[in-house]
UniProtKB/Swiss-Prot annotation:
One of its GO terms (biological process) is DNA catabolic process. The keyword Cytoplasm applies. Bidirectionally degrades single-stranded DNA into large acid-insoluble oligonucleotides, which are then degraded further into small acid-soluble oligonucleotides. This is Exodeoxyribonuclease 7 large subunit. Keywords: Cytoplasm, Exonuclease, Hydrolase, Nuclease. The lineage of its organism: Bacteria, Pseudomonadati, Pseudomonadota, Betaproteobacteria, Burkholderiales. It comes from the Bacteria.
Length: 453
């Protein structure tokens, strides 16, 4: 009899993974241990699919790795990679489960070396900003009506054609001066700075445009030089910089008095359209016409009022002469009547007095003596009253506080202006005002003694 001796699996045997589970576990491990990182290499086997996704291999001299950049990310790249391009990609390490291949899921791509350029850009920006070159208070206003516009760019640049077309459309009356210079390549930064300095020295323009079209960071690098930035700041003419596209920023943009997103926008900012100027002038003319109309109306009313009051000089003189004669007549009449009445009354009194006088010499002498006595009494009374008045005046003068002060006394008042009459009304460290004959003094109370020792 044969027995079944096949061994049973031990309870501690490891679990068996499926291929899918294994790939999922490896994918999680890769994503957990390799965060978003920059990887450099050379482009190989590049394919742009109809879906918009990019597929390529990133390699160096010893190894290679597959990479994918999906359309949502690829649309923000500023260049189309080509075979052999040296690039840097910012990517996650992922696993493509169907084949079990690990690959890079690219979030961003740039040409090799751009990272170093960007670091240099940030360092120079921080340095110049610390020196105050980018201070908004330093920036000059762009003139509203520029008669002459200078342009610093390459004569062969497409940006120049865009600028000239815009200026011709918006402000054909504006004079344009070109200061030609290379805008990329070796030595171009020095030539750009020299062109800006030339425009500043000639002082021919009301505003200066420094422009070039779009390109890679290397193409625009001439506008990230310190010399160009310092020359823009030192320029005596307001400067508008329009370099690249709206998303491109250079050191020259920060140094300029005004940054334009594109060369065309720079031309639009520099030149106000003729139609806008005509509309503004027409509005100002309407305002002036309204003001003049109001002034003329007010002046006409004033003139009409004055004309009604105005008469000929001869008539005016005759009228005033009649007024004068009338006043003279009234004055004479007013003075004659009281005088006549007074003379008549005096004559009556004299007659009455003469009629009542006794016709004797003694009575006449008595009256004369009586009149003399009365006169003397009146004079004596007046003299006595004057003496009394003088005595009262002297007494009043003696009671004048100013006289008391002139004899060496002083008057003390507290903070409220109340006169201090007793020591108990004072407190130590209290501030009082001492009034003397010729002025006042602020005095602090050191101590108070209510009785004299």
């Amino acid at each position: 009899m044969i027995s079944d001796r096949s061994p049973s699996p031990p309870s501690s045997a490891p679990a068996v993974l499926s291929v899918s589970a294994l790939n999922q576990a490896v994918s999680r491990m890769l994503e957990r241990n390799f965060p978003l990182s920059w990887v450099s290499g050379e482009i190989s086997n590049f394919t742009c699919a109809a879906s918009g996704h990019w597929y390529f291999t990133l390699k160096d001299s010893a190894a290679q790795v597959r990479a994918v950049m999906f359309r949502g990310r690829a649309q923000y790249a500023d260049f189309m990679p080509r075979e052999g391009d040296k690039v840097e990609v910012r990517a996650l390490v992922t696993l493509y489960a169907p084949r079990g291949d690990y690959q890079l899921s690219v979030e961003a791509i740039r040409r090799a070396g751009v990272g170093n350029l960007y670091e240099a850009f940030l360092q120079l920006k921080e340095k110049l900003n610390a020196e105050g070159l980018f201070d908004p208070a330093r920036k000059r206003a762009i003139p509203s009506f520029a008669r002459t516009i200078g342009i610093v760019t390459s004569p062969q640049a497409a940006a120049l054609r865009d600028i000239l077309t815009t200026l011709q459309r918006r402000a054909p009356h504006v004079r344009v001066i070109l200061y030609p210079t290379p805008v990329q390549g070796e030595g171009s930064a020095n030539k750009i700075a020299q062109a800006i300095a030339t425009a500043s020295a000639r002082a021919e323009c009301d505003v200066l445009l420094v422009c070039r079209g779009g390109g890679s960071i290397e193409d625009l690098w001439s506008f990230n030089h310190e010399l160009v930035a310092r020359t823009i700041v030192g320029c005596d003419i307001p400067v508008i910089v329009g370099v690249g596209h709206e998303t491109d920023f250079t050191i020259a943009d920060f140094a300029a008095d005004l940054r334009a997103p594109t060369p065309t926008a720079a031309a639009e900012l520099a030149a106000t359209p003729r139609a806008d100027w005509l509309a503004r002038l027409e509005a100002q003319a309407d305002d002036m016409r309204y003001v003049l109309k109001r002034q003329l109306s007010d002046t006409a009313q004033t003139l009409d009022w004055l004309s009604r009051r105005l008469i000929s000089p001869a008539a005016y003189i005759a009228h005033e002469r009649m007024k004068l004669q009338n006043l003279q007549a009234r004055l004479g009449h007013a003075t004659r009547i009281p005088l006549s009445k007074a003379q008549f009354a005096l004559a009556q009194l004299r007659n009455r007095w003469l009629s009542q006088l006794p016709d004797t010499q003694a009575q006449r002498l008595h009256v004369i003596n009586h009149a003399r006595r009365m006169s003397n009494q009146i004079n004596n009374h007046i003299a006595s009253q004057r003496q009394s008045l003088a005595a009262l005046s002297a007494q009043l003068e003696m009671l004048n506080p100013q006289r008391t002060l002139e004899r060496g006394y002083a008057m003390i008042t507290d903070e409220k202006g109340k006169i201090v009459r007793a020591p108990k009304e004072l407190q130590p460290r209290q501030s009082v005002t001492v009034r003397l004959a010729d002025g006042t003094a602020q005095v602090g109370i050191a101590s108070v003694q209510e009785t004299l020792e």
